[in-house]
């Protein structure tokens, strides 16, 4: 926001030379640019050093706005909070950094984010890249992670969503993701669940029921229509 306003003011003065910004205005522009440069933490996860949930949402919204296509992979660390209790905060944070560095090296800049305490999210731009990442990530999690000479076996579930086939808006992305993670959690360790037509239909049916129930609660009742066969 700071950069956008500052750029607009500079552009205005360049385009319309008769409009001169005062010294106070110029100072404000410089302050806004300085704050933007000095505040990268807004988009960085302080634990892992990679992009955070805010950065991910900004990227995904931009991708959806440009009407492109691609894949979003969510890697959920099963039972991470139980492991956190055993290892303690410092070692758990080191474990997250190890995972973040691995995914960053594998996926590249602007493609991996630490979006929750027990979850990382990755962008894949093509089907081929998505398939490669699925295989590489699953293979890596089959081996232990080493933190302070402790060997840690981590279970994970990976869910894969394609846009715009599976979702076209942020709310739909989050709803579908939770539905897929719920299904993945029933399937055991190191599982990969990819949205397909059947799963999408199941999710949308359940979503309609949830909306109907919420409306019934709000309106304190609902109508039932019976059509004899």
Sequence positions of predicted segments:
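Interfacial "cap-and-anchor" motif at the non-cytosolic start of specific transmembrane alpha-helices
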Residues: 1-43
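The cytosolic transmitter module of two-component sensor histidine kinases
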Residues: 24, 52, 92, 130, ...
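A cytosolic-side transmembrane-helix exit/cap motif
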Residues: 40-52
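Conserved long alpha-helical elements within nucleotide-processing catalytic cores of c-di-GMP signaling
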Residues: 49-71, 78-104, 113-117, 127-135, ...
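Hydrophobic scaffolding residues in well-structured cytosolic catalytic/regulatory domains
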Residues: 56, 120, 223
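Short hydrophobic alpha-helical segments used for membrane anchoring or interfacial signaling
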Residues: 73-77, 160-162
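A short glycine-enriched loop-to-beta-strand structural element that forms part of the catalytic core
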Residues: 113-123, 140, 144-182, 187-196
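Active-site core of bacterial EAL-family cyclic-dinucleotide phosphodiesterase domains
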Residues: 205-229
